[in-house]
Amino acid sequence: MDSSWFEKISKEHEVVGLIAGNGPLPVLFAREAKARGMKVVAVAHEGETLPELEEMAWVVQWVRVGELRKLIETFTKRDVKRTLLLGGIDKKRALKELCLDDWALRLIQRLQQRGDDTLLGALAEELGSHGICVLSSQELLRPWLAPEGLITGPAPTEQQEADVRLGIEALQAMGGLDIGQTVVLKEGVILAVEAIEGTDQAIGRAGLLGGPGAVVVKGSKPNQDMRFDVPVVGSKTITTMAQVEARLLALEAGRTLLLNPPEVIGLAQEKGVILVGWKARGGDGKD
């Protein structure tokens, strides 16, 4: 994580909010913030957020997905003016256990489409109306964003490079449809497209269909709000690829997060997975 980000925010605000989803990111952030003398007021999601967050945050309020009023009041009661969104929410669980309060229902009624990006953008606007600014997680996590070019492993073959190009084209074509952020290919054939199951299960499905040698391409959606919705790859993805003998993982440079880069890169080297970073044609990897 970017130490200069903490230095800047801690000078301006002793208390910072955290809307915590699943995975290790919320806990890692809260631990770093606590070590720097900051107080984290966290809204954690039942069944999603790691309980270890309670050891690191100053305040933790547990909510169900959709309890917007409780979320906002947790922040306003502690005079939180800045907050981050870190970690994801399992879409399958959210569909089954969604608990929309009256505030959330009004928010959704104002939306014309139900894509993740739109919902998160609307949430940021709603928080802003209560005097709470959503900070960019991309700035905080910049040191962990994938670089362009070969990250580890041997240079890709011509066929692998062709598969990466096709995967990028597919991702860009699907971006406006709010489909997932991952495409799995082999020798010019698309084996799987990520949907609600998530990246790792899409890779597993592709392995069953196409066998060894697949190429995985992951990136952001064209209009994705990178303040709080950065695509993430961790060690679990590398392990899943190794299990189905997928050979190469191509990540959008500057817009895809390597969760603990030394660990991910080291595991990729151990498992024989090539890592590369790509940039969209004409893109600069920044917002």
Residue locations for each model-derived region?
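Catalytic domains of riboflavin
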Residues: 1-4, 19, 26-28, 125-135, ...
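N-terminal basic/disordered segments at the start of proteins
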Residues: 2-45
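Conserved mixed alpha/beta catalytic, RNA-binding, or beta-rich assembly cores of soluble enzyme
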Residues: 15, 33, 62, 117, ...
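N-terminal glycine-rich phosphate/adenylate-binding segment common to multiple enzyme folds
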Residues: 68-141
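Short coil/turn connectors at secondary-structure junctions
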Residues: 11-15, 36-39, 57-58, 78-81, ...
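General beta-strand structural signal in soluble alpha/beta enzymes
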Residues: 18-20, 42-43, 83-86, 116, ...
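Short glycine-rich anion-binding loops that position phosphate/pyrophosphate groups of nucleotides
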Residues: 22, 88-91, 189, 221-222
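Feature captures the catalytic cores and cofactor-binding loops of soluble hydro-lyases/lyases
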Residues: 45-80, 97-106, 115, 201-287
